[in-house]
Structure formats: C-alpha cells, structure tokens
C-alpha cells in the first residue's frame, strides 16, 4: 500500500515527467481516492504580486526537486505559458520557502496540501498573505493537458484572506499492485468505510468530512 498524488501515479505508470526514461509501471492500481491536495501559491501583499504573470523575475520556492509540489509547479508554469527560466526558482520545500518569505528572502511559495495548512497560517500571523489564482486560460490549459487536475477554490475563510481564490487540486489516492488479492482489498475498504472507520477518519482533519459527489454521466 502507498499514498500518492494522482499526478505522480500517472507519470509513473506512463513514464513521463519526473519518470521520463524509466520503465512504465502498468501494474499500479488506485484502490480509492482520499482527499484533494490543493495547489496554494502563496505570497504576501507587500510583494505587489497579484497574478501569475507577476511572478516573472521574482524569487519562487517550487518545492524539493521531483517532489509532488515541484511537479505541480512545473506544470502550472507551463499552463501559464511560462517556464522556470522566467523566475528566480529555488528548489525549497514549502516549509523552507515560507520561512524565507518571513525573512524577506523569497517572494512566492508553492504549497500543495490540504486547506488550513499550518505553515501558511503561521505566515498569516506575521504578514498579510495573498494567493495567486489559477484561472481563465491557465486552468483550461492545465486540465486539458493534465486531466488529473480539477478546478478548485481556496475559501477566504481558510486563511482569513479578502477573497476566495480559484486554483487547482489533485487527488491523493491509495495505491496498490494489481496482484493484491481481491479479498484483501475488500477487507481494507470495508474497514475504512465502516461507521467506525469513517468516524475515525473524519476526526483526523476537517477536509476528511467533505463528501465527493459522484456523477454517473
């Protein structure tokens, strides 16, 4: 069993992106979807950055090399018609990038996580934060080329910002090998989706209580 973001899983299955040049892994199977990892591109009001285009020439923490955050950052630059060459990119984890924002050494941090991220909240106690939107042509480009992304929104109540911010998200999934016996899969899912299992998961994080609507169309 493993937990991974769906974008990383597809890249691994089909050997592209971070897995370019490696063998394909067609035996990977998603057993269940878990929670949305929300792309949160955070900056502070004193930078003057309001749109993705404003990132040009700025200091941007994009995540550790080939991490889930960094893979998201690379694709989102692409969706906006830009590349890392357009900014002063630093391969920092989002915690490190946010620390540098506090110290005035970084302008923007890519964070891919559930909403209510503690490091972003801490930054918000020190500076007025703002999220850079992913909308319009950018979200259209992103979801068309990489359909594992979905449009999402960061509610203003999540971090006490002035407005809701349109963005993108990818699902975290529970991953197994296709050789895992069906009865084992059944037992795992039965345990998770039992009344006790759902109560335990729901108590772990606010996003775990949100239902995902299934569309038969």
Named regions from a protein language model:
Residues 1, 33-103:
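Bilobed "Venus flytrap"/periplasmic-binding protein-like clamshell domains
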Residues 1-4, 59-60, 102-111, 126-130:
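Alpha-to-beta junction loops
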Residues 1-22, 95-100, 115-124:
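Pocket-flanking alpha-helical
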Residues 6-9, 36, 44-47, 65, ...:
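Solvent-exposed coil/turn segments that connect beta secondary-structure elements
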Residues 21-34, 157-166:
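A structural signal for short loop-to-beta-strand junctions that line the ligand-binding cleft
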Residues 31-38, 124-125, 135, 166-169:
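Short Pro/Gly-enriched coil loops immediately N-terminal to beta-strands
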Residues 92, 96, 103, 113-131, ...:
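An extracytoplasmic/periplasmic, membrane-proximal ligand-sensing/linker region
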Residues 130-187:
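C-terminal lobe and pocket-closing loops
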């Amino acid at each position: 069993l493993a937990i991974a973001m769906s974008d990383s899983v597809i890249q691994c299955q089909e050997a592209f992106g971070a897995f370019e040049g490696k063998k394909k892994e067609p035996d990977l199977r998603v057993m269940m979807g878990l929670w949305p990892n929300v792309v949160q591109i955070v900056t502070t009001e004193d930078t003057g950055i309001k749109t993705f285009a404003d990132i040009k020439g700025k200091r941007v923490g994009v995540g550790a090399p080939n991490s889930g955050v960094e893979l998201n950052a690379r694709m989102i630059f692409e969706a906006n018609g830009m590349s890392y060459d357009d900014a002063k990119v630093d391969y920092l984890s989002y915690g490190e990038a946010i620390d540098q924002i506090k110290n005035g050494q970084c302008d923007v941090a890519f964070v891919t996580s559930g909403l209510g991220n503690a490091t972003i909240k801490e930054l918000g106690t020190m500076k007025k934060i703002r999220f850079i939107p992913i909308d319009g042509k950018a979200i259209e480009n992103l979801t068309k080329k990489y359909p594992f992304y979905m449009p999402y929104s960061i509610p203003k109540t999540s971090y006490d910002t002035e407005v809701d911010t349109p963005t993108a998200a990818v699902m975290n999934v529970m991953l197994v090998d296709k050789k895992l016996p069906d009865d084992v899969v059944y037992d795992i899912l039965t345990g998770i989706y039992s009344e006790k299992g759902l109560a335990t998961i729901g108590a772990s994080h606010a996003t775990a209580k949100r239902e995902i609507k299934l569309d038969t169309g």
